[in-house]
Structure formats: structure tokens, C-alpha cells
Amino acid sequence: YTGVDLGTACVVIAVLDENKRPVAGAYRYADVVRDGMVVDYIGAVQIVRELKEQIEEQLDTELIYAAGAIPPGTDLLDSGAVKNVIQGAGFECTNLLDESTAANQVLQMKNGAVVDIGGGTTGISILKDGEVVYIADEPTGGTHFSLVIAGAYGKSFQEAEVFKRDESHH
């Protein structure tokens, strides 16, 4: 199984085996998506293609199929662009799922919540008896967290981004 997530902060590809266990993954910080919308189509295709090639070399196999993850509630708004990016990078797009629901395909929770804190938004899925009963996309994410760090510590936004990603500050 291969999944592609075009995020506000990162573009990610994850590969799972037949038992849905992670076997490979790659990511790159990128500014190709803003507020769930692809704003740099060519850049997004290039990054996904490069990550795909990196993983194919690592696994010594060709990745043919991929599903895409999109922010909750944006399927009518931008899912076509996400699908086109995936296809433009050389995959056959098999499915598009909201990010939290896609995560639960791996987690397989029966009851609870999946919270996906992204760069620009936070996706939330509530599950009951294994079914998604509520989906929301809140307009707060890592970018907002960086703004808080910048203000609290008197840093530039870029310095706050670097500070936030440094594991010694966790």
C-alpha cells in the first residue's frame, strides 16, 4: 500500500506491507499547498516524483498504485488537483481519503478520535463501532503554533519553524 499526503508543511509518501505495517517512507518540507489547496502544481508533481523514485530505489521495486490523503471537507474543492499530482508523478491513483480516515485505515480504531495536526489545519475524525461518524477540519495547525513560538520567544517566523522542529525542544 502506498499513500501520498500533500500537506501544507510537508509532502509525504508512506509505503505499507500487506499487513499494513510501515516498510518505507520519505518526506520533504515544501510550500506547494496552502490551506488544503495545491498552489504549486508543477512543484508538487516534481516532489512526489522524486520521493517516489527515492523509495523505489530503497525498496528495489516499482511503486505503481497510490492513494491520496486530503484535508477533511475539501474533497469537492481540491481533490481533483491532488489526484492529478499523484498521477503526474507516475502513480495510478486508487483512492482519495480524508487524512484522519486514511490514518485510521492503518490504526483500525473502533471507537475514538483520530487527530491529524497538519501545517495549516487540524483534521479530526470521530469513530464509533469502526465507522466515521464525524469529520472536521479546524483552521489551526503547525503554522499557527510557529506564530505563537515566534511571538513568545521574539523570533522570526522562520526561526520559530526551525526551533519547533528541533527535537531538543520537545
Regions found by a protein language model. Name each.
Residues 120:
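Short glycine-rich anion-binding loops that position phosphate/pyrophosphate groups of nucleotides
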